């Protein structure tokens, strides 16, 4: 009943292949200090956003005495906390959505083809790693990168696919799409 153990090299290679599908962006790096009996001990804190550019994205926070180690820890934490966000046509949001964390508030709006990513700082990193191509975002309140990223994730978690909405309402997805296109044409006139 003894199971054969694969060599570690193969485990490492499969892990590297899995990690190669992700794109990571460093959002913020801070120098932090811990006060100890002999004075201050300095370290670094990193905030990293990771995504596969196909609708999965996550963020992580890591602290260490050296910058590369803090970034590595943050990247690993981000890969453990991935969420899936349904995208319309693989490029934008299905509907407008608000998010909030602490004093940071964000408004995310779907956009037409060719609009691009109109967002500042930390939000842009989230959208690029998510694989979103057209979105308009506005942040108000706190401009702290940690709050902005968490508020953006709060908004993205509230993104609902129209198929789920149709199922909740007990109607067919095609009916919902027809209503959506009819209301879209009426607003353009």
UniProtKB/Swiss-Prot annotation:
Domain S5 DRBM: 22-85
Gene this chain is encoded by: rpsE
GO MF terms, alphabetically ordered: rRNA binding; structural constituent of ribosome
InterPro entries (alphabetical): Ribosomal_Su5_D2-typ_SF, Ribosomal_uS5, Ribosomal_uS5_bac-type, Ribosomal_uS5_C, Ribosomal_uS5_N, Ribosomal_uS5_N_CS, Ribsml_uS5_D2-typ_fold_subgr
Protein name per the record: Small ribosomal subunit protein uS5
Species annotation: Rhizobium leguminosarum bv. trifolii (strain WSM2304)
PANTHER family given in the database record: MITOCHONDRIAL RIBOSOMAL PROTEIN S5
Keyword RNA-binding assigned: yes
Oligomeric form and interacting partners: Part of the 30S ribosomal subunit. Contacts proteins S4 and S8.
Family classification: Belongs to the universal ribosomal protein uS5 family.
């Amino acid at each position: 009943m003894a199971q054969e153990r694969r060599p570690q090299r193969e485990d490492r290679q499969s892990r590297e292949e899995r990690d190669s599908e992700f794109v990571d962006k460093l959002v913020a790096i801070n120098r932090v200090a811990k006060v100890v009996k002999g004075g201050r001990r300095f370290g670094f804190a990193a905030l990293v956003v990771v995504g596969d550019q196909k609708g999965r994205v996550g963020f992580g926070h890591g602290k260490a005495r050296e910058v590369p180690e803090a970034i590595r820890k943050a990247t690993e934490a981000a890969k453990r906390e991935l969420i899936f966000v349904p995208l319309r046509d693989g490029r934008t949001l299905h509907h407008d959505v608000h998010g909030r964390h602490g004093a940071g508030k964000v408004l995310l709006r779907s956009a037409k083809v060719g609009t691009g990513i109109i967002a500042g700082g930390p939000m842009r990193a989230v959208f690029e790693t998510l694989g979103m191509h057209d979105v308009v975002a506005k942040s108000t309140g706190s401009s702290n990168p940690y709050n902005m990223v968490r508020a953006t994730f709060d908004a993205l978690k509230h993104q609902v696919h129209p198929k789920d909405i149709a199922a909740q309402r007990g109607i067919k997805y095609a009916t919902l799409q027809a209503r959506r296109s009819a209301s879209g044409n009426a607003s353009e006139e």
